[in-house]
Amino acid sequence: MRTIDKRIAPNVRLAATLVARAPALTLAYDARCKSRLAATLDTGEDVALVLPRGTVLRDGDVLVADDGALVRVAAAHEAVLLVRAPDALTLTRAAYHLGNRHTPVEVGAGCLKLEYDPVLADMLTRLGATVERASAPFQPEAGAYGGGHRHGHDATFAEDYALAQQVFDEHHGHSHSHSHDHDHDHDHDHDHQHGPCCSHGHHHGHR
């Protein structure tokens, strides 16, 4: 069995005909996140994938086997949700909640794509988005996913969070409640501009 152990850097240009002749390794997103994997090329050949830990393969990547042969990566069709909305605010709220759950998302023009999840589909529908189940390649945004942070002047935070928590509780049959006390007080005044829609001073009191 051949071992595939190298990925050619994306900035290295290869002849298109050379890449086109290479056998394809077609994988869903979850499999493309694994650095150790037993897989089958589109030719029917079984191979072992042994890449540096933390490697996430993307559609179009070119790999090198231990015999020097090239293998091209293709994103497989898989069950996904296509999320659209009647306005930018609704789509932004949808993206916010998905990011708050560290959900991998592929961002398109006026559309979000994520792996199929009935709980998330329900939540997104209640937020006012249109959710369509489909079969398509999935290639989410690359980068680190961080936790969300609540801001006191986010006027819709409480409403959005309550809706998301309600959906989660209905699907999982229980709720989790976390309370955090902070023993510090500080006030600060500052003027800042948010853009053409906001230009005013704010006084924040945090407790």
From Swiss-Prot:
GO molecular function: nickel cation binding; unfolded protein binding
Source superkingdom: Bacteria
InterPro entries found in the cross-reference section: UreE (IPR012406), UreE_C_dom (IPR007864), UreE_N (IPR004029), UreE_N_sf (IPR036118)
Main location as per UniProt: cytoplasm
Alphabetical keyword list: Chaperone, Cytoplasm, Nickel, Nickel insertion
GO-annotated cellular components: cytoplasm
Record keyword Acetylation present: no
GO BP of this protein: protein folding; protein-containing complex assembly; urea metabolic process
Keyword Chaperone recorded: yes
Skewed-composition ranges (Basic and acidic residues): 170-194
Region (Disordered): 170-207
Free-text function comment from the UniProt entry: Involved in urease metallocenter assembly. Binds nickel. Probably functions as a nickel donor during metallocenter assembly.
NCBIfam families assigned to the protein according to its UniProt record, in alphabetical order: PRK13261.1-1, PRK13263.1
Family: Belongs to the UreE family.
Full protein name: Urease accessory protein UreE
UniProt organism field: Burkholderia pseudomallei (strain 1106a)
